[in-house]
């Protein structure tokens, strides 16, 4: 028969844990709402830059080479994770999809302490690491990351750059993704700029293209960083909400167990008293 005091202590312990998970859920919800607004603003900016850049690419003669020759057959992965856990499968899903694609000759730029820890056995593949990013990711941070990635590309260390991030679908669902950001294919997507719009490039479209690449990369990475942050907070909110509900259920079961044990003990004591009086 379980000890009444032991069961009571377990109830108190789980109740304290529930208070912590509930507080973390509320904090994540508050942060997520603010970060989601930031993401929508950044996404609008990133999409505008991408739209203009797509138009630039569409104006370039297909015969013209946009990128340096002699690049190594290697991919640079920019991996966006979190610094802390308690976010369900947010980080593990990122690592799983990357492990399914990465090769020994590939390179890594790791964002977030979780990715840094997970890939610590791939030190020879790591170009740079970033951690302790704020909830409100700034363009300056995105620029630092994009500059590091672009240097590897222009130095011919890699022949393509991909971002491993978490796409925000809604408050419940987020999806890990791998997106190629360099090289850019001709006419990568339909531009929202009107087809009859007249664009003039000085001194020429190729020069504008090469000048615009840093802005394009930083803007796209900026969007991925903010989207991943929203996804992280949404995943943490869901995980803490689930933990709080599980704690409530467990406390309920323990209270039933406590009452049953208490009732059994009382019944046993009554039986002993009755048996003693009969004797």
UniProtKB/Swiss-Prot annotation:
Any Pfam family hit: ATP-synt
KW Membrane (keyword) present: yes
BP terms from Gene Ontology: proton motive force-driven plasma membrane ATP synthesis
InterPro entries, per database record: ATP_synth_F1_ATPase_gsu (IPR035968), ATP_synth_F1_gsu (IPR000131)
Membrane topology of the entry: Peripheral membrane protein
Recorded superkingdom: Bacteria
Any one Gene Ontology molecular-function term assigned to this protein's record: proton-transporting ATP synthase activity, rotational mechanism
Main location: membrane
Compartments where located: Cell membrane
Keywords noted in UniProt: ATP synthesis, Cell membrane, CF(1), Hydrogen ion transport, Ion transport, Membrane, Transport
Cellular component GO terms held in the UniProt record: plasma membrane; proton-transporting ATP synthase complex
Description of how the protein assembles with itself and partners: F-type ATPases have 2 components, CF(1) - the catalytic core - and CF(0) - the membrane proton channel. CF(1) has five subunits: alpha(3), beta(3), gamma(1), delta(1), epsilon(1). CF(0) has three main subunits: a, b and c.
Protein task: Produces ATP from ADP in the presence of a proton gradient across the membrane. The gamma chain is believed to be important in regulating ATPase activity and the flow of protons through the CF(0) complex.
Family of this protein: Belongs to the ATPase gamma chain family.
Protein name: ATP synthase gamma chain
Gene behind this protein: atpG
């Amino acid at each position: 028969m379980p000890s009444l005091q032991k069961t009571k202590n377990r109830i108190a312990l789980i109740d304290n844990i529930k208070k912590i998970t509930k507080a973390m859920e509320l904090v994540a919800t508050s942060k997520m709402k603010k970060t989601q607004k930031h993401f929508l603003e950044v996404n609008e900016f990133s999409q505008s830059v991408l739209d203009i850049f797509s138009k630039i690419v569409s104006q370039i003669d297909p015969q013209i080479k946009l990128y340096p020759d002699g690049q190594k057959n290697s991919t640079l992965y920019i991996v966006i994770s979190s610094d802390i856990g308690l976010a369900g499968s947010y980080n593990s899903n990122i690592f799983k999809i990357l492990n399914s694609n990465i090769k020994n000759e590939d390179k890594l730029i790791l964002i977030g302490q979780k990715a840094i820890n997970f890939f610590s056995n791939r030190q020879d593949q790591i170009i740079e690491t970033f951690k302790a990013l704020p909830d409100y990711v700034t363009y300056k941070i995105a620029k630092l990351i994009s500059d590091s990635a672009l240097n590897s590309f222009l130095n011919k260390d890699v022949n393509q750059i991909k971002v491993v991030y978490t796409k925000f679908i809604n408050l419940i669902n987020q999806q890990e993704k791998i997106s190629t950001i360099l090289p850019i294919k001709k006419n990568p997507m339909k531009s929202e700029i009107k087809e009859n719009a007249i664009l003039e490039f000085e001194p020429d479209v190729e020069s504008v293209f090469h000048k615009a690449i840093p802005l394009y990369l930083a803007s796209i990475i900026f969007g991925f960083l903010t989207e991943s942050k929203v996804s992280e907070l949404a995943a943490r909110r869901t995980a803490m909400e689930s933990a709080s509900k599980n704690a409530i259920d467990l406390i309920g079961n323990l209270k039933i167990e406590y009452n049953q044990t208490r009732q059994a003990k009382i019944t046993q004591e009554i039986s002993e008293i009755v048996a003693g009086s009969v004797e």
